[in-house]
Amino acid sequence: MTTKVAIIGLGIMGQRMLTHMRLHHDFEPDYLWDPNKSACHQAIILDPQSKVMDSASDAISKADLVYLACPPAVREPYALAAAAAGKALFLEKPFGINLDDSARLMAGLQAYNVPIAVNFTQASGAALTDLLVAKERGEMGALLGVDVIVTYPAWPRQWQKGADWLRFRPEGGMTREVISHFLFFTERV
């Protein structure tokens, strides 16, 4: 059985996920929506099999799984609508633009019995797997602490330039976009 997927938010991450999901026969990322018509047009060029729906609600109604790649300021209503409709959720982070908004979203989602996952790609990669194996074998010695040092020649990174909201602290910034991966990573270690 294939999983029918709606993608809400067709910027960089939405388009990347569309391309990668299409490679897997267990997923049908056929239902798309974004308020930006240009992003919708780009997504259809990338994947002519999919269809831009008239609204986010239409996309959600057709899917088994809803991937939310929209900016965090607008994510909550889509997430709650999908959960209320009994749809599994795959979320980008951060959940909201501050801790209160994020906590409210999580509390709201807990009222529904739907699977929820967050796209922390580095948490399932070879680097973490290798590190956990080395830790288990005692090859690292005693863990005394963690230093996270992140630098980039430019922010946002070149591949993220289309997501202008990432440049600004209220919704993005390097800490929310990058450091969150490393915090999740180190928490697992």
Tell where the protein language model's regions lie, with residue ranges:
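N-terminal Rossmann-like dinucleotide-binding module
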Residues: 1-47
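Beta-loop-alpha module in the N-terminal Rossmann-like domain of NAD(P)-dependent dehydrogenases
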Residues: 17, 47-108
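Short, Asp-centered acidic motifs that coordinate Mg2+ and/or phosphate
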Residues: 31, 65, 145
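Short strand-turn motif at the edge of the Rossmann-like AdoMet-binding core
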Residues: 93-94, 120-122, 150
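Rossmann-fold dehydrogenase core element
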Residues: 104-122, 144-146
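Predominantly a Rossmann-like dinucleotide-binding segment in NAD(P)-dependent oxidoreductases
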Residues: 125-189
